[in-house]
């Protein structure tokens, strides 16, 4: 199988959760004998897509993907490996009640609709996406991908003695809420350390120094790779309701148990990618969201005389197929009960 993996950035440029996950997926597909070519979204042209007509496409982060390419891909086999909320103008569902945005805030809808599948990372993630887009091609992969090397490194760190205190992700991204996490620790009079490093394994070592991790994001996290890493390291995780990983049953696991769960999950995700490109469909998609009916409540006056004309006018309404008609007995003159 030949695959082109499109993303805004890759792990050699940015040490982000999405980029690390994508790197492991690409390597896992290669180990199974597939050809995987990584291409930055800003470098993709219509000519490039046409020249690679016999390839399948995985689209990761696509902020820099030109609109014409999104339209061109409709003629090809592609999946969207969703890392945040790029179906919203502001990419932050927290701005809207119940995480459901008004139609005017929805973007890229056709791009999502035309994909063979949209891979979400947690139950929390896919429920938000599903409630905003009326699509039936959404799948929850319920996890992330780590290399065997990283999992072995995490396993070794998990057995090391930890000090009493909190680790805090040191991020300059405002919605990661680093300062809010620090204030939380201060409110508990608890010691804390900011954790950062451009070297992934060094970052994990620093993270694992303490027995607790606090993360209080201000926007819904599709999973939060670092929260899962903290659990694999055997740490307590203090968080809020905006972390997708916490919606998964396996989040109650920690240490080696969770490490082995994620090792298996990586292979299951790769299985799903192979399956969807081979068959054109994938199991365990969410059902299409059923939009609520419009309820029309009315009463009748002399219903036995006027019902025919009333119903003729009613069924001619353009949206009547999506309506339910409720007739209330108002005890008006005429044989209402017969009607």
What are these regions (language model features)?
Residues 215-226, 241-242, 246-248:
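Nucleotide-sugar-dependent
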């Amino acid at each position: 199988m030949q695959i082109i993996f499109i993303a805004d950035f890759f792990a050699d440029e940015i040490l982000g959760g999405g980029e690390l996950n994508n790197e492991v997926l690409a390597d896992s597909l290669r180990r199974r004998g597939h050809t995987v070519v990584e291409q930055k979204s800003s470098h993709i042209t219509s000519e490039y897509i046409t020249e690679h007509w016999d390839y399948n496409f995985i689209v990761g982060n696509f902020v820099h993907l030109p609109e014409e390419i999104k339209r061109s891909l409709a003629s090809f086999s592609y999946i969207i490996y969703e890392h945040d909320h790029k179906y919203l103008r502001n990419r932050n569902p927290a701005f809207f009640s119940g995480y459901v945005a008004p139609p005017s805030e929805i973007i890229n809808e056709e791009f999502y609709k035309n994909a063979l599948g949209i891979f979400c990372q947690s139950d929390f993630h896919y429920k938000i996406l599903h409630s905003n887009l009326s699509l039936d091609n959404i799948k929850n992969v319920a996890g992330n991908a780590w290399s065997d090397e990283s999992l072995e490194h995490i396993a070794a760190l998990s057995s090391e003695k930890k000090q009493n205190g909190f680790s805090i992700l040191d991020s300059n991204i405002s919605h990661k809420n680093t300062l809010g996490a620090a204030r939380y620790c201060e409110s508990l009079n608890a010691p804390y350390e900011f954790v950062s490093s451009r070297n992934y394994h060094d970052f994990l070592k620093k993270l694992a120094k303490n027995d607790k991790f606090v993360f209080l994001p201000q926007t819904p996290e599709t999973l939060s790779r670092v929260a899962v890493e903290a659990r694999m390291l055997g740490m307590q995780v203090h968080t809020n309701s905006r972390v997708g990983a916490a919606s998964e049953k396996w989040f109650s696991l920690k240490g080696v148990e969770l490490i082995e769960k994620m090792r298996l999950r990586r292979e299951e995700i790769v299985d799903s990618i192979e399956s969807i490109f081979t068959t054109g469909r994938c199991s365990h998609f969410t059902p299409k969201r059923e939009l609520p009916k419009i309820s029309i409540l009315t009463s009748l006056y002399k219903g036995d005389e006027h019902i025919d004309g009333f119903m003729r006018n009613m069924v001619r309404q353009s949206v009547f197929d999506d309506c339910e008609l409720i007739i209330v007995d108002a005890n008006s003159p005429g044989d209402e009960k017969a009607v």
